[in-house]
């Protein structure tokens, strides 16, 4: 790695440390976003049908469970 020349050598070293911290935070945010998306996908996959049944059972007129589950 090349060393910076001139009076700003300490400032350049501090900037390198800041860039490292920003990179770590960026990586953390990316991993957290991926984890959140995976969990949301699973929740949506297993929760959609029960949600539809619950909404249907609370509607007026109240249908029977067989009417909710039948495609017709």
UniProtKB/Swiss-Prot annotation:
It is a single-pass membrane protein. Residues 2-41 are cytoplasmic. Residues 60-72 are mitochondrial intermembrane. Pfam families: Tom7 (PF08038). The chain crosses the membrane at residues 42-59. Coiled coil: none annotated. It is found in: Mitochondrion outer membrane. GO terms for cellular component: mitochondrial outer membrane translocase complex. The keyword Mitochondrion applies. Keywords: Membrane, Mitochondrion, Mitochondrion outer membrane, Protein transport, Transmembrane, Transmembrane helix, Transport. Its main location: mitochondrion. GO terms for biological process: protein import into mitochondrial matrix. The keyword Cytoplasm does not apply. Belongs to the Tom7 family. Forms part of the preprotein translocase complex of the outer mitochondrial membrane (TOM complex). Seems to act as a modulator of the dynamics of the mitochondrial protein transport machinery. Seems to promote the dissociation of subunits of the outer membrane translocase. This is Mitochondrial import receptor subunit TOM7-1. It comes from Solanum tuberosum (Potato).
